[in-house]
Amino acid sequence: MTAQGIYLDNNATTRVDPDVLAEMLPLFTEQFGNPSSMHGFGAAVGGQDRMGAQAGAGAARAAHDSEIVFTSGGTESDNTAILSTLEAYPKKKSIVTSVVEHPAVLALCDYLEKKRGYTVHRIGVDNRGNLDLDAYKRCALGPDVAIVSIMWANNETGTIFPIEELAQLAKAAGAVFHTAVQAVGKIPMNVRHSAVDMLCACGHKLHAPKGVHALYVKRGLRFRPIVRGGHQERSRRAGNGERAGHRRAGGGAHVALMHMTDENTRVKRSRQAGAAILAAVPNCFVTGNPANRLPNTCNVAFEYIEGEAILLLLNEADIAASSGSACTSGSLEPSHVMRAMGVPYTAAHGPTRLSLSRETTEEEIDRVIRVVPGMRTGRSVSPYWSQAAPEGVRPVYS
C-alpha cells in the first residue's frame, strides 16, 4: 500500500523499484554525456547502454545483446516491428493479427488496410479469450503474409496464447512473427530457442521508468529502420533516447526475472483467492481463461453496472483498478476485448481489471474483497437492465 492507497493497476504501469531509481539518479547528474561522443563522458554512458541491453537480453533469454533495440515506448516498438517488416518484404501484402490486440497494433493495421491497400486477417477468440487456432491455420497463413503480430498474453484478461505454436506455423509459411509486451517478466520465455522473430518489452510494466521500451530483433532478420537519422541503436533507431532509463529498463527486466517464480506463486495465490470471492457476488463472473492466464491478472465482469461507477466506488476506498485497457479507458463503448469474447451487453460495460504486482499484499486483497459488495447499490440505477444488446454482442455468455 502506498500513501495514495492500494494500487491494483499494474498492467497499466508499475511503481519504479527504489533500487532501480537509486541506480538511475547518478546518470542524470554525473554520467550525463552523449553516448555518441568520443570523450570519456560519452563512453561512460555508452557503457550503461550496453549493460541495459545485456540485462534486457538476459530477461528474454536472447542470444545476443545486439538483438535489443531501445525505443520510446510500446506503441513505437509495435509500429516499428510491423512497418519495418513491410518495408523489408515489399511484395507481401498481408498481415495477420487478432481481434483482441492492443490499439497500438489494431489502429496501425486499420490504417494499413484502408490507406495502403494491405489485407489484414483478424483472428477471433472464444468466450474465454482463447485464439481460434483453426481459423489461424486455415485462412491466415499464406505466401503473401509478411508479418504475424499477436500478443503473448492479453492485457485485459490475462489469457495466454500458444505463442510457440503460432510462431512455428508463421515461420513455416515464411512470415515474420512479432509478439509480447504484457507477458514479459510475468511468465518464462526463451526467444533464443524460439521461432519468435521480434518481441516487445515495456520497462514501465516491470518497475522500471516510463518512456523506455525494448524491441528484440532476432539476429539475421531483415530490418529497416523507421526512425531515421543518426547511427544510434546500431543504426536501427535514430535519436538519443533516455539513457538512464535504458540502463534500468534492462535492470527492471532482470529483477523481474529473478523474482518471477516466488512472485508468481504468491501473486497467483492472492489472485485466485480474490477471484473466488468476487465470483461469489451475484451477477458477476471472471473473464478470460481461468486455467491459462497471467498470474497477476483478474478481470471481473459485473452485470448491470458501468465500469466507471465501479472504479469510482473503488477510488472512494483508495483502491486503484481499471476498466479495460488504460489506452482506451476514456471511451464509453464496451471494450473491444469483451465484445470479441461475446460478453453480454449487461456486463460488457462493467469489467474491472485487478492487476497485481510483487508489491501487492494479501491484506490489500482482503480490503478489496470487503469493498466489492457495494456494487449492488450501483446496479439499482443502471440503465443496462432494459437496454437492448448492440450488433456484435451475444445476449448470453456461455
Swiss-Prot record:
GO biological process annotation, one example: nitrogen fixation
Positions with a binding annotation for pyridoxal 5'-phosphate: 74-75, 155, 182, 202-204
EC number: 2.8.1.7
Binding site for [2Fe-2S] cluster: 327
Keywords recorded for this protein, A-Z: Iron, Iron-sulfur, Metal-binding, Nitrogen fixation, Pyridoxal phosphate, Transferase
Compositionally biased spans, kind Basic and acidic residues: 230-244
InterPro entries in alphabetical order: Aminotrans_V_dom, Cysteine_dSase, PyrdxlP-dep_Trfase, PyrdxlP-dep_Trfase_major, PyrdxlP-dep_Trfase_small
Gene Ontology terms, MF aspect: cysteine desulfurase activity; iron-sulfur cluster binding; metal ion binding
A Pfam family: Aminotran_5
Needed co-factor(s): pyridoxal 5'-phosphate
Active-site positions on this chain: 327 (cysteine persulfide intermediate)
Catalysed conversion reaction: (sulfur carrier)-H + L-cysteine = (sulfur carrier)-SH + L-alanine
Modified residues (N6-(pyridoxal phosphate)lysine): 205
EC category name: transferase
Region (Disordered) location: 230-253
Main function: Catalyzes the removal of elemental sulfur atoms from cysteine to produce alanine. Seems to participate in the biosynthesis of the nitrogenase metalloclusters by providing the inorganic sulfur required for the Fe-S core formation.
Subunit (UniProt): Homodimer.
Family from the record: Belongs to the class-V pyridoxal-phosphate-dependent aminotransferase family. NifS/IscS subfamily.
Protein name from the UniProt record: Cysteine desulfurase
Gene label: nifS
